[in-house]
């Protein structure tokens, strides 16, 4: 009986050995959590739809730009066909019908808008308006993917800054720096190639060629200089698309490198800063003058800007709603009681 009294109240079924002195302590699953899932119900069929989206932090990998590529191909294909059929209603410098249609489609999508080839009839103007908004949607999709990549990259950077070794962090920083250098070299190559083509093929002066290239890659498109020959427009179809994407990637990687540095500096400052009595008071969420591991982690996450007090309050409200017996813990019975009662079949009503 005495031996039974000395056993722990909560026992996992295996021998638990105390960790050696000085060993790192690991957070384990809360013992009050259910060891198995409750029986499946009809509501479980929608669990896949309720699953959170995959990110870099949760193992989803880098956001795919496949959708952007498909939209780009579809836009260029439909736009070329549409403007090919409407080419009789266009005015400006003309070369060949198909090449001019593709050239005008690319200039419209990238919002360069030289003005050397413009719609002349009402039908052509309405068609151009439709493809202007469609092109902006394609560019917006690319920017949204880039923004998602930056946000998810921040999650991965925070995790690595808190858990990885110094050498691994340096390798990740160098990887971003190399991507920025590569994009910079591609940008220089795009500017140089465009300048040479405008100088040699279009017959512009070197300064005018460089001026037109800068106005093009930044999608400014003043319109006083543009591609007018058949060879120049054939080059411009691929060059304008590639150069504008390279510029966007260059600034994306520059923002990523800057964000990564700021994130690492913030994580390093939080980890190295000494915890004071004021920090303990701020971390004491329940006001019992004791700060547990969960309270401390939440305080550090708030300090890093990864979670706010509003988020914590929402989570606590959800916990209170699920805690049917008000025991302070969750069990399968609490979850079953919190589930709404399904409507009976129409035949039983």
Swiss-Prot record:
Residues 1-53, 326-349 are annotated as: Disordered. Gene3D superfamilies: 1.10.287.70. It is found in: Vacuole membrane. Residues 271-306, 310-345 form the EF-hand domain. InterPro entries: 2pore_dom_K_chnl (IPR003280), EF-hand-dom_pair (IPR011992), EF_Hand_1_Ca_BS (IPR018247), K_chnl_dom (IPR013099). Keywords: Calcium, Ion channel, Ion transport, Membrane, Metal-binding, Potassium, Potassium channel, Potassium transport, Repeat, Transmembrane, Transmembrane helix, Transport, Vacuole. The keyword Transmembrane helix applies. Pfam families: Ion_trans_2 (PF07885). Residues 1-66, 144-180, 255-349 are cytoplasmic. PROSITE patterns: EF_HAND_1. One of its GO terms (molecular function) is potassium ion leak channel activity. GO terms for cellular component: plant-type vacuole membrane; plasma membrane. It is a multi-pass membrane protein. Ca(2+) 1 binds at residues 284, 286, 288, 290, 295. It comes from the Eukaryota. The chain crosses the membrane at residues 67-87, 123-143, 181-201, 234-254. Each of the two pore-forming region (also called P-domain or P-loop) is enclosed by two transmembrane segments (2P/4TM) and contains the GYGD signature motif which seems to be involved in potassium selectivity. Highly selective inward-rectifying potassium channel that is specifically located in the tonoplast of protein storage vacuoles. Functions independently of the voltage difference across the membrane. This is Two pore potassium channel b. It comes from Oryza sativa subsp. japonica. The gene is TPKB.
């Amino acid at each position: 009986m005495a031996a039974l009294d000395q056993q722990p109240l909560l026992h996992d079924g295996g021998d638990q050995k105390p960790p050696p002195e000085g060993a790192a302590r690991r957070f384990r699953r809360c013992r009050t959590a259910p060891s198995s899932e409750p029986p499946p119900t009809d509501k479980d069929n929608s669990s896949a739809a309720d699953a959170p989206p995959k990110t870099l932090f949760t193992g989803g990998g880098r956001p795919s730009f496949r959708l952007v590529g498909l939209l780009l191909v579809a836009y260029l294909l439909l736009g070329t066909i549409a403007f090919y059929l409407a080419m009789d209603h266009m005015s400006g410098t003309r070369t060949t019908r198909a090449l001019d249609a593709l050239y005008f489609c690319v200039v419209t999508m990238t919002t360069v808008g030289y003005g050397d080839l413009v719609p002349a009839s009402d039908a052509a103007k309405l068609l151009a308006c439709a493809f202007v908004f469609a092109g902006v949607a394609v560019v917006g999709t690319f920017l949204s993917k880039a923004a998602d990549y930056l946000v998810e990259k921040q999650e991965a950077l925070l995790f690595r800054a808190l858990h990885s070794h110094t050498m691994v962090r340096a390798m990740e920083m160098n990887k971003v720096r190399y991507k920025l250098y590569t994009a910079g070299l591609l940008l220089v190559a795009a500017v140089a190639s465009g300048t040479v083509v405008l100088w040699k093929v279009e017959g512009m002066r070197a300064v005018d060629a460089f001026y037109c290239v800068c106005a093009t890659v930044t999608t400014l498109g003043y319109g006083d200089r543009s591609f007018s020959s058949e060879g120049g427009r054939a080059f411009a179809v691929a060059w304008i698309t590639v150069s504008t994407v390279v510029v966007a990637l260059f600034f994306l990687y520059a923002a990523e490198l800057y964000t990564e540095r700021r994130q690492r500096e913030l994580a390093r400052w939080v980890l190295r800063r000494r915890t004071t009595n004021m920090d303990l008071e701020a971390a004491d969420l329940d006001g019992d003058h004791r700060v547990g591991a969960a309270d401390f982690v939440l305080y550090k996450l708030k300090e890093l800007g990864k979670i706010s007090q509003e988020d914590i309050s929402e989570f606590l409200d959800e916990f209170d709603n699920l805690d049917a017996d008000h025991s302070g813990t969750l069990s399968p019975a609490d979850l079953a009681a919190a589930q709404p009662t399904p409507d009976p079949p129409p035949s039983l009503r």
